[in-house]
């Protein structure tokens, strides 16, 4: 920590606090009840019609949680080590709109950036995503598929929405951020900490009245987002209700230099990793929160809640890397159109009892059913008029004149056939060459008319080349349409070829006549990938609390338990369909013989276009649904106990314990099967005489190719071995010591642990390929964390300064490691390189934090309303391992010069650079106006503190290529050769200034406006920099030059404003 520099502002606040202590009143030495570090979210809302002896306490509680209340002050005696609570009022004042804004002015916590799919959870104390707990109203939120194998295979290609779902900020009453091990509250997953949300309730608004109405409109320029929120709360006799309906409609976040391209055409042509502008997406969120309560008397309450939200992203992956740049452009070959969705629906029923008994003062029983679906749909097709599949240079179009359908060109005339030598060629109505643009494959007997879209009672003008007597015509003829019926009852039309009456050597002659269609297919083939990650959670939960005195000690007891069942599954749906369909593919379809055989009767094929008639290419083809992961049901049984003990006026203890028993029950759904090739042979190989691959089966060998009974038997044997149950048990604890030696100093110590049970994909995922295979591991251990923390808080009235130091130790980190080369088929010499998730690493993070707030009015009465704030987090950490990481051993055999790099402790990319946040603000005594200035200062991420997981394939090295040792030159990154394991992209130091103000001209009206990045600073955050990929097709830049990195920069100067009416 030699580089740490103490803040001048923090020193000033400390000096001011200490200077004022001399004038402070003497301590009362009265014991102060302190809330426990609760293992689960407990309700703070009590019924408003409590017994008389509780009315004052209830009133105080309700005033504290009043969403529209004015107080933002922190009760130092209630603040826990490493814990921050953010109220709804503070979020509204800061104009927070998403998870990024939630932690914008916090230090030591950031969001994980994923590019197209947005933020994915949080990064705290060196770990991120699934290693940081997220809960909403007591329910854990969806986890990502976290296995490194899945990330290597699928995540870098944008085929899955593999993110942690977020919450609508307008629904949040409080957000509690805990840094450090926290399984006590969040259960499995909270190694680095947790973020726990509690949603609003009708009682938060109905303090002194029976109704509340609010309408809020907002707008922010960084993504052109429009906000509309309607809030209704009411109470009638024994019933109360709350409805919050929120709509957000905007587009992608505008990076710095967003308007780099001069026009829309240039914008659409800037494709691939070198694109410097954020990809165009339309992003909407619709959220509805409804809570209905029934309280027949002061001791009983029933309630039901619905929390339903959908986040949808539509747009084009212009930076998508998988396209033939050298020979094509997006205007001819198309782009990747995406439609991602994150849906969350939670229905909750609860019963509360407020009768005081020897066992509880308050008891709550709740049942919740939560369904989360993260969908990623991509359509790869060309959607413009310039696409090859819909090319129509002559502008041919269909018109109806005087009861006759005619095909005319772009000039409004008909094509003409001109005799050129021994042949005829088409000219358009202005005499221009059109022959190369007209299809030769639209004979009358191969084309049927869709009578559902055209009026088949009218005639159609066709082009006749030879009549039924084989005489040349090269002219138009108006024909009647004969109507037929398809098996589904729909009508179609046909125009039969005329046949001659005089037979010839090959039968009766028939005319040669056709439709004059454009030469292209008339549609673009849409390659659709529609993939869902589903999480369905059901929970029954019992919470009890009791306050009592025992001898000379005071106790606040919390205890209870829960049973939770979660089904996690994946559904892949891949199919091809027609997109950008033009009239000649829409109004007509193919008539062809079965198998395309000549001489057989032609029948209608509505799923085949006229252009695809020869090969029988279908417009729509569906291979059905499948999955790469077996569905797994997780059952979790939990018991918890917590007691806050006040031993004396200056000594208190937090004693908290939780027991988790997690069971994984894998299953298999035949409706969405796992492809057999992913499972067959992984445990039980095929026999030497089994032919698994090949065009033929030699004599004496057994046919075990795909879909044979032999293959299916091996698949079933391996599946049975894969479907093994696993379970994990863990004892979590959180022990705290609170010392109050004076009325201006509080000392707190915390010792806590946490665990993360492996996710189902880390245990059960399988994949098989000669270049890269993954085997399951049902013997994985749970990851664990232990946190030690000490905090010193100096305070006076509403001002405080907290200095804390922490250490977090992680064990049994799960990592993908090379296991061995293994034969799948004993009769084959091919060995598959198998990787497996194993417990490898351990890590340690140390750091210090400062949090302070100085109310200037506490020092000088004339400065009443002014306040200063300062926060800082400084942390360092490394991942340690007693043996080489995966793949290093083979690499070092040929490249021993890199031994020192491969053997050193690995930096932790999830650690944020040193961050400070300064706050200067003023609130008028009338509370009618105020403003805040936030200054965020972030240090550069040092090269030695970053890690590039692909470094062994990028440095200059020797490789064994097909048995020959060759030297491979170094990959260039940003114009320089990669020489070590340092991260390729890092942020420089930056300072950002935000200014936010509010104004209440009348009681019911509030205006809020802010300028963000006031100085228009160009900067790249560390979380955006580390999201840039070297492999895959998304979130890429041109590694050699760094072109495309501008796409990842934060927005320049931007503005937000909102207006809220309240009644």
UniProtKB/Swiss-Prot annotation:
Positions of the TBDR beta-barrel domain: 208-1063
InterPro entries noted in UniProt: Plug_dom, Plug_dom_sf, PT, TonB-dep_rcpt-like, TonB-dep_rcpt_b-brl, TonB_rcpt_b-brl_sf, TonB_rcpt_CS
Membrane topology: Multi-pass membrane protein
Additional remark text: This protein is subject to phase-variable expression associated with alteration in the length of the CCAA repeat region. This mechanism is called slipped-strand mispairing. Addition or loss of CCAA repeat units would change the reading frame and result in introduction of stop codons downstream of the repeat region. This may be a mechanism of regulation and a way to avoid the immunological response of the host.
Domain TBDR plug: 66-200
Protein's recorded name: Probable hemoglobin and hemoglobin-haptoglobin-binding protein 1
Residue window of motif TonB C-terminal box: 1046-1063
PROSITE patterns per UniProt: TONB_DEPENDENT_REC_2 (PS01156), TONB_DEPENDENT_REC_3 (PS52016)
Chain positions of Sequence repeats: 26-29, 30-33, 34-37, 38-41, 42-45, 46-49, 50-53
Family: Belongs to the TonB-dependent receptor family. Hemoglobin/haptoglobin binding protein subfamily.
Chain's role: Acts as a receptor for hemoglobin or the hemoglobin/haptoglobin complex of the human host and is required for heme uptake.
Cleaved signal peptide residues: 1-24
Pfam families to which the protein is assigned, alphabetical: Plug, PT, TonB_dep_Rec_b-barrel
Main location: membrane
Taxonomic classification: Bacteria, Pseudomonadati, Pseudomonadota, Gammaproteobacteria, Pasteurellales
GO (cellular component) term, any one: cell outer membrane
Keyword Nucleus set for record: no
Compositionally biased tracts (Low complexity): 28-55
